[in-house]
Amino acid sequence: MTGRRARIGVMGGTFDPIHHGHLVAASEVASQFQLEEVIFVPTGQPWQKAERDIAPAEDRYLMTVIATASNPRFTVSRVDIDRPGPTYTIDTLRDLRAELAARGLTDPDLFFITGADALAKIMSWNRAEELLTMAHFVGVTRPGHRLDTPTGLPPDRVSLLEIPALAISSTECRERIRQNRPIWYLVPDGIVQYISKRGLYRRTDGGR
């Protein structure tokens, strides 16, 4: 249907590697906000993590495709990894709107999913005030953490949601791999196999 209005989730992240916490968070937000689709957007060159070595963008993209393949509401976009230079959310949302318009979704309601800790710092993001006009921001956090809307943010543009599976982190997954400890059940089975085949995260000297 051309020109129809849709509710679309956007989950940007390094996904280094993607894990079940990401997937459960996306699924819960989709359910709570009645989203038709959640688009996962692996970052190209994340400006917040410029000092940390990360896996190649193509590996992170392919892992995200593998991890999301079984859910028909999940899709993956290359808009960030195909764009040169640092990744800023303002560019992600702009390019996604163009991508969605090409599919006939000319005026979607976007719901940007991020960690509640990152949401608390949103006013330091590039063109933050404009960002808040482009999407509704959903901050996800693990149980037991306070769910207070950050001061100064418009309450009608920001929501907070508790997600049980967020006890998992990509940092923990990388450390377990470096220590030769298993990551089964922390990440999808296909990701365990992909990481093993590609030899990702094994070295601590910056090699891959």
Curated annotation (Swiss-Prot):
<dbReference type="InterPro" id="IPR014729">
    <property type="entry name" value="Rossmann-like_a/b/a_fold"/>
</dbReference>
<keyword id="KW-0547">Nucleotide-binding</keyword>
<dbReference type="GO" id="GO:0009435">
    <property type="term" value="P:NAD biosynthetic process"/>
</dbReference>
<dbReference type="GO" id="GO:0004515">
    <property type="term" value="F:nicotinate-nucleotide adenylyltransferase activity"/>
</dbReference>
<protein>
    <recommendedName>
        <fullName>Probable nicotinate-nucleotide adenylyltransferase</fullName>
        <ecNumber>2.7.7.18</ecNumber>
    </recommendedName>
</protein>
<keyword id="KW-0662">Pyridine nucleotide biosynthesis</keyword>
<comment type="similarity">
    <text>Belongs to the NadD family.</text>
</comment>
<dbReference type="InterPro" id="IPR004821">
    <property type="entry name" value="Cyt_trans-like"/>
</dbReference>
<comment type="function">
    <text>Catalyzes the reversible adenylation of nicotinate mononucleotide (NaMN) to nicotinic acid adenine dinucleotide (NaAD).</text>
</comment>
<comment type="pathway">
    <text>Cofactor biosynthesis; NAD(+) biosynthesis; deamido-NAD(+) from nicotinate D-ribonucleotide: step 1/1.</text>
</comment>
<dbReference type="Pfam" id="PF01467">
    <property type="entry name" value="CTP_transf_like"/>
</dbReference>
<keyword id="KW-0808">Transferase</keyword>
<dbReference type="InterPro" id="IPR005248">
    <property type="entry name" value="NadD/NMNAT"/>
</dbReference>
<dbReference type="GO" id="GO:0005524">
    <property type="term" value="F:ATP binding"/>
</dbReference>
<keyword id="KW-0067">ATP-binding</keyword>
<keyword id="KW-0520">NAD</keyword>
<keyword id="KW-0548">Nucleotidyltransferase</keyword>
